[in-house]
Amino acid sequence: MDNRTARFLKTRFQKYYKNAEIGLPDHLPNREWAFIFFDSMPDKMMHRHKAFGSPGEALDYLYGMAPAHVYNSTAYYEYPDARKMNEKNWLGAELIFDLDADHLPDAPKNYADMLELVKKETFKLMDFLLEDFGFSEQEIELVFSGGRGYHFHVRSPKVLKLGSAERREIVNYLSGRDLDFKYFFREVAMDGEFGTGSKTFKGMKNVPFKCTLVGYDSGWGRRIALYLTDYMKAECGKRYKKDMFPELRRYEKVGDTTIKKLISLTNSENGLKDILEKGRLDFDVRNFKDIAAYFMRESVEDFLHRFGTSVDEPVTADIKRLIRVPGSLHGGSGMLVKKLALSELEKFDPLTDAVVFGERPVKVTVLKPFSVQLKGKDLRVEEGIQEVPEYAAVYLICRGVAEYGHRRNQPGPV
């Protein structure tokens, strides 16, 4: 990035920061801040160990300096501006999750498709936080990163003092990597508060057992019930019986009679409903518990792809992490780091809703062919001098595929 291009971006960012609504963190005086300035680009030298005593001080700094990237600590410190980390006196930290397309298997290369995939992962993580961990919506802050994903900030006394090891355990739970299906498919005693039917014969108590899906109504048990019943419905929706349940036909305990009973169970009035709502596995299908457990083991990769979520483990485990500030601009895209209510995620379109610059025509020198969709328009540029809307110019320059103005001996638009 040449000096003229850096100056152009800085003036555009400064104009934005003049009236920007910045999501300043709670306990502002206890947060460390860090910045990358346009003057250091493209080296991206980070200036950190900065602290602010008041909102006005922080906002004045952003307007005056117009940084390319703005971060604050997820941790709370007694002395956030201390130059050495061991002198800051760590007081606790938010629980942070970073969902980025870089960490998703087979993420599409197209930017719009990439963001759509990350949004689906974001919904899955939201379900974990609200349903499995029981955090309230008021304890969760959702932020579009301004780049390729989303950040979750969990601010709760329950997580404040968690160490790195405990935070890694949470990541493991989210991924499902340590799931043991034997735990979920079990025989449970029908005695006492769990049921009736115990009998005593010759002084010996006989306690009957029933096959059940443990935890069917919450957490991973609920996801197993959904996956299993969805599979059974899909198989019975096939046209020919010979094509149904091919995965189960490979199991030694499954023959033609079992397949017929599985079809009958699936098509019955309450069969799948009983699995979902009661965790029931004691049907007129021999070894149904073992068959279900076998299917889950064989399908574990697809199951975890559907229900697990891939967060950036080092980010969550780091109790002294720096993260982008909501309301700031992402120097790698020029887009807004935007805070969202959880209810806003469904309709949120980052390629429109996180674009803050206007339509004023700007001449740029495109360094290589590039295409992207912004503000509902397909933008395609070729190498050479191009005139594009300001929002597109900022994006192209931040992505490193264009420079401001025009160079000599560069071809103009055809």
Curated annotation (Swiss-Prot):
Cofactor dependence is on:
Mg(2+); Mn(2+)
A single MF term (Gene Ontology): metal ion binding
Tell me which domain of life the UniProt entry assigns to the organism this sequence originates from: Archaea
Recite the UniProt keywords alphabetically: DNA replication, DNA-directed RNA polymerase, Magnesium, Manganese, Metal-binding, Nucleotidyltransferase, Primosome, Transcription, Transferase
Q: Which residues form the active site?
A: D98, D100, D312
Q: What class of enzyme is it?
A: transferase
Q: Which residues form a coiled coil?
A: none
A GO BP entry: DNA replication, synthesis of primer
Its EC number is: 2.7.7.-
On whether Transmembrane helix is a keyword of this UniProt record, the answer is no
An annotated GO cellular component of this protein is: DNA-directed RNA polymerase complex
| Classification via Gene3D superfamilies | DNA primase, PRIM domain
Instruction: Describe the function of this protein.
Output: Catalytic subunit of DNA primase, an RNA polymerase that catalyzes the synthesis of short RNA molecules used as primers for DNA polymerase during DNA replication. The small subunit contains the primase catalytic core and has DNA synthesis activity on its own. Binding to the large subunit stabilizes and modulates the activity, increasing the rate of DNA synthesis while decreasing the length of the DNA fragments, and conferring RNA synthesis capability. The DNA polymerase activity may enable DNA primase to also catalyze primer extension after primer synthesis. May also play a role in DNA repair.
The record describes its quaternary structure and partners as:
Heterodimer of a small subunit (PriS) and a large subunit (PriL).
PANTHER family linked to this entry: DNA PRIMASE SMALL SUBUNIT
Please report which protein family the annotation says this sequence is part of: Belongs to the eukaryotic-type primase small subunit family.
Protein name (record): DNA primase small subunit PriS
**Protein species of origin:** Methanosarcina barkeri (strain Fusaro / DSM 804)
